[in-house]
């Protein structure tokens, strides 16, 4: 199995050899099917270093790899990783000792857009099965439950309700990058979460009415209360809490978490939208010397470079302590989106967290845990793409 790399944190390769003089690293970065003998066409970098400390040379490769890892989300949950082959050759000042590389580069590497914390040490590998930190998920009533897993280690995912198995999916390993992360859902369909999304996905037109809303609030086609994620060594249990919200329109936010996987989070309560406008101004000369007059309907104070940006403030609803980690990863994420559903389309909006500081709440100290997070759209109001 390939070694995992989380490229938002440094990743070091150490080559050790008696009397080593220089080391040359060739990095092959690519998607698709893994090949042990990397093609020259996939060679992205060649680095050569001379020995500084006798006996070994160290390369840091995470930033180089991340240049070729592009994360996108358009509503589809896909595996977004890259294969890396790190081939190292050395020269020695004398002798013919064998070089060793740490971590072992024999089976190559699979790079995720994840990161480790300071206290997790160098070259953090993190979980090799479940690709999320929380063991509780708050889901909107009648919405999908989506569990991101690493297929190189996970063997199965089972969904339970009241102790009865609703669905079990076996997870298979793959040599293709498009199957390294699998998003397992209770429905078996990755991309449709709610009744509204299912209507739009089927090409229908969504008609809203109080009777229909009341009916939808009374049913739940994907109800589960536990999910078991199994590897060869252990099983992790995730508790599912279903939330019924009748007053506000819940919003689904999707972000890349610390494991480099897409993760959903519902904001159940009140949301407020606003627009901020910025512009430059100058005082124009509107006097006409030929007539010794000026037009009183003409702007003396002129605006230019006028631009706007939309913002939205969301409230999570009432959570438990387990979601403090989710909030942290959301604010640390560099790719965040929310899904907006109209009568005929499902639109994914890229956003940036404006909230840069958070005080973590606990049920012991605060009783009810609700977070208010501000976001702004990751694009200008007026199209200025050139």
Model-derived regions, located:
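Preference for solvent-exposed, low-hydrophobicity sequence contexts
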Residues: 1-246
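Extracellular/virion structural assembly segments
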Residues: 2-12, 16-20, 168-178, 185-189, ...
């Amino acid at each position: 199995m390939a070694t995992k790399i989380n490229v938002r944190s440094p990743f070091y390769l150490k080559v050790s050899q008696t009397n080593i003089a220089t080391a040359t690293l060739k990095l092959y970065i690519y998607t698709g099917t893994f090949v042990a003998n990397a093609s020259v066409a996939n060679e992205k970098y060649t680095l050569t270093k001379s020995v500084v400390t006798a006996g070994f040379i160290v390369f840091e490769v995470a930033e180089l790899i991340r240049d070729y890892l592009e994360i996108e989300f358009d509503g589809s949950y896909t595996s977004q990783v890259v294969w890396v082959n790190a081939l190292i050759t050395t020269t020695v000042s004398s002798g013919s000792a064998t070089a060793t590389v740490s971590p072992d580069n024999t089976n190559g590497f699979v790079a995720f857009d994840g990161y480790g914390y300071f206290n997790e040490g160098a070259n953090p590998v993190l979980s090799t099965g479940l690709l999320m930190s929380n063991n509780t998920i708050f889901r909107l009533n009648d919405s999908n439950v989506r569990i991101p897993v690493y297929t190189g280690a996970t063997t199965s995912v089972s969904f339970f309700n009241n102790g009865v198995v609703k669905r079990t999916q076996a997870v298979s390993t793959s040599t293709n990058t498009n199957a390294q992360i699998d998003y397992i859902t209770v429905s078996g369909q990755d991309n449709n979460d709610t009744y509204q999304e299912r209507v739009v996905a089927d090409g229908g037109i969504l008609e809203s009415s109080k009777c229909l809303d009341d009916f939808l609030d009374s049913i739940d086609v994907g109800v589960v209360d536990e999910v078991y994620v199994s590897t060869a060594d252990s099983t992790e249990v995730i508790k599912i809490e279903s939330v019924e919200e009748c007053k506000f329109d819940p919003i689904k936010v999707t972000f890349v978490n610390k494991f480099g996987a897409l993760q959903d989070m519902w904001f159940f309560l009140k949301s407020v939208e606003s627009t901020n406008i910025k512009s430059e101004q100058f005082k124009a000369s509107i006097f006409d010397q030929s007539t010794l007059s000026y037009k009183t309907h003409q702007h003396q104070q002129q605006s230019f470079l006028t631009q706007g940006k939309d913002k939205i403030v969301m409230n999570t609803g009432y959570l438990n302590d387990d979601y403090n980690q989710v909030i942290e990863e959301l604010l640390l994420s560099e790719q965040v989106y929310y899904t907006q559903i109209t009568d005929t389309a499902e639109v994914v909006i890229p956003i940036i967290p404006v909230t840069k500081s958070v005080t973590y709440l606990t049920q012991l100290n605060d009783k009810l845990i609700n977070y208010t997070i501000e976001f702004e759209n990751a694009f200008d109001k007026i199209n200025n793409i050139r």
